[in-house]
Amino acid sequence: NEVCPPGECQQYCCDLRKCKCINLSFYGLTCNCDS
């Protein structure tokens, strides 16, 4: 899981075809990707 800029989920930090952006209060937005 890579940390994304606040409020955004971009393809450079996640593959949106495989990943969902999840907002974790401590980490901010992260990419949750299927392995």
UniProtKB/Swiss-Prot annotation:
Presence of keyword Membrane: no
Secreted is among the record's keywords: yes
Tissue specificity of this protein: Expressed by the venom duct.
Subcellular location, principal: secreted
GO cellular component: extracellular region
Gene Ontology MF terms: toxin activity
Post-translational modification: Contains 4 disulfide bonds.
UniProt keyword annotations, A-Z: Disulfide bond, Secreted, Toxin
Name of protein: Augerpeptide hheTx4
Domain notes: The cysteine framework is XV (C-C-CC-C-C-C-C).
Subcellular location: Secreted
